[in-house]
């Protein structure tokens, strides 16, 4: 029985300890149940579970809880959670501060960007105003350009009218001069007729027989040499302005006179022409400077030219002459092509005539110049010829020689330009500024077809005088200029 009692005692003690543990658990689990009720409940449960075993009941005095029950087993977890929460809060606070600083920075940037946007808007507004002002100024400029162009057109029309009027005046002056020549011719003829009649009357009085005396034809007045074959070929001569003027000046060939009367020396021992150039006329014995009929090789074109047989060594064909300003050289293309002026005064032979002359062999060019103080100089070029009209009479020059200075080589290889045919290399029309026709470059070192100013130095908006830049400069208009050509024997003048 003793071991059994000891065993029961240990069971009772374990039960009591379990009850205490259950009480603590009960206190933690619920706040409404009392410890006593908990013990009785356990007792009844154990009693019901084992009725066959012996049971012992231990009455343990009830303990009152006067303070808070601390459970040490859970305290580290709570502290750990609190620490975690504090760290998270600190991280969140730091993140919030960082976000706040970023927001403030963004606000500052937005404020700055807002200022820039306002400035950009202001600049755009100013740009629109400026564009409007520029457009307005551009329109004003266009109106001004159109107005000036209209003025230039009116000025060009006036210049053309002046040119036409000048041409009409020149034609009238030429006709008047021709009438004077005809009047002088008729007066001389009438005088000769009177002398012939008087001689016949005297002769009749001396002859005693009644045999009638044949009436001699009237003697011809003295005249410039004219080929007798001219009347047969007059219809073949080109009908330009120069040739028209010359046709009016042609005098009829002399009629045979009586042996007893005085007459001009016969020229039947000399060839009558036409000649290929003035040198051939000189070689045929015609050594007087005058008008000659010329027919270049390889063409049926007949032309009258002035042959200078006095300028050593003679045989020079004059293609241009300026001496008194009586002829206007500000002409159009067609006039420069055919020629114009008075062949015994100021004149231009014509581009087409010069082309045919210079393309029948090697010709040289001689330019003689004189200023208003009487100084004379010359410029000679070893070769001179023109290309055909299809090349706009392009200039071809050879080596220079002379004492006037070389102001023509710069124009070598250039095409001829007039007011209505612009072939120069300048952006504008050089003929408009130089007031003539020439082989302009951009524009001129020489302008021998320009305006003839009296006195030398002239005042003009442009350099439009008759000048040779290497001799007296571009603002000095020369007094006399002659351009003449001659076959080149490979020797300088």
UniProtKB/Swiss-Prot annotation:
GO annotation terms (biological process): blood coagulation; cell-cell signaling
Annotated Fibrinogen C-terminal domain residues: 269-489
Subcellular location: Secreted
Stretch forming the signal peptide: 1-22
MF GO annotations: signaling receptor binding
Sugar-modified residues: 164, 192
PTM info: N-glycosylated.
The protein's name: Angiopoietin-related protein 2
Species whose genome carries this gene: Homo sapiens (Human)
Upper classification of the organism: Eukaryota, Metazoa, Chordata, Craniata, Vertebrata
Gene: ANGPTL2
